[in-house]
Amino acid sequence: MGHGSDGGGGQAGTWNVLKRVSSWIDVVTEDELSPGDVHVVDLGGIEVAVFNVAGQYFAIEDVCTHDGSEISTGCLYDHVIECPRHGARFDVRTGEVLEPPAYEPVQTFKVRVENGMIQVGDDQ
């Protein structure tokens, strides 16, 4: 009866875990990051690229999962960044691979704006 059930009709033993951001790192002001631009910041040894896509901000690890090169220097088309080395494409909103030769997504980071300052969440 009460054993092995979560009481909510779902599968036993499955839980939704919310990940909290431990701290926020100031990156750049909104005025300094125009639509279509990117700014790279070191987040505890991880290079993070912050993009302005039509007034919305997104952050991904600045590394192509295909060969480890930086992708922030590639071409940004709307929400898609293309790696300058071999042409892999990633969605900067989700980190999803849109075109090989990469097959693994890039890590994404939470972004917020506080008093005109774009901040990236350090949830490592």
Question: Where are the regions that the model predicts?
Answer:
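Short acidic-hydrophobic sequence patches enriched in Asp/Glu that either
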Residues: 82, 103
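N-terminal pre-ligand scaffold of iron-sulfur
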Residues: 2-6, 13-78, 91-92, 96, ...
